[in-house]
Amino acid sequence: MPELPEVETSRRGIEPHLVGATILHAVVRNGRLRWPVSEEIYRLSDQPVLSVQRRAKYLLLELPEGWIIIHLGMSGSLRILPEELPPEKHDHVELVMSNGKVLRYTDPRRFGAWLWTKELEGHNVLTHLGPEPLSDDFNGEYLHQKCAKKKTAIKPWLMDNKLVVGVGNIYASESLFAAGIHPDRLASSLSLAECELLARVIKAVLLRSIEQGGTTLKDFLQSDGKPGYFAQELQVYGRKGEPCRVCGTPIVATKHAQRATFYCRQCQK
């Protein structure tokens, strides 16, 4: 599933082609996504794009009359393409722009979303979200406070959007390795110093992944059709049985809440 770096990479890739251009119309080839494509999107016409923003894993396209909320789901990607390029099997939604380009949404598993809202505030998919991990609001003191009474393992807690948004399976595993923290540790057992370190490395890991265009393991592509290259730098995720790049101990894979977790027994305590 695309996580924060992949969504931010998509935002940065599409923004220059959308802001300042006008949506001439939308084409919905298959509206049966995770939720049905909003009827307002079918009727879009002559709408200038004012901004392209991100909240958590949602892309937010600001138009004069409202907002398009896009979620990439499990396998979605957004590409900027020439209008004349014919669609392929899994190209479900596109915005035809005044500059001769199209924003084309591809989603083999159809678990994403294209929604419309007049106002962002109070929309059900955006309520109850924690702070952005790259913001000043997410820091060691905040993390320590939120972990203090939490009697669950730190790995699934990091993936809870009420704590912090956008830290999914890949980056939770990678960040815990970078901080030397075992994923099975109770969240409440982390000291303030450990929380400060963990908050710092989460920011560093996410920023590095954004620099590399995100992580492509299967379906994710950047807006120019290229894969994300952070997969080449993964320290533990997807490396079961391979030697740790630091100490040589074989990487272990377990499951938390049906999600694979990767770690080094020697480096993480």
From Swiss-Prot:
Gene Ontology biological-process annotations: base-excision repair
Domain of life: Bacteria
InterPro entries in UniProt: DNA_glyclase/AP_lyase_DNA-bd, DNA_glyclase_Znf_dom_DNA_BS, Formamido-pyr_DNA_Glyclase, FPG_cat, MutM-like_N-ter, Ribosomal_uS13-like_H2TH, Znf_DNA_glyclase/AP_lyase, Znf_FPG/IleRS
Cofactor(s) the protein needs: Zn(2+)
One Pfam short name: H2TH
Keywords attached to this entry: DNA damage, DNA repair, DNA-binding, Glycosidase, Hydrolase, Lyase, Metal-binding, Multifunctional enzyme, Zinc, Zinc-finger
Residues noted as binding DNA in the record, renumbered to the chain: 90, 109, 150
Active site: 2-3, 57, 259
Cofactor remark from the record: Binds 1 zinc ion per subunit.
EC number: 3.2.2.23, 4.2.99.18
FPG-type zinc finger locations on the chain: 235-269
Family label: Belongs to the FPG family.
HAMAP family per UniProt: Fapy_DNA_glycosyl (MF_00103)
Known partners and oligomeric status: Monomer.
Name under which the protein is recorded: Formamidopyrimidine-DNA glycosylase
Organism expressing this protein natively: Escherichia coli (strain 55989 / EAEC)
Gene: mutM
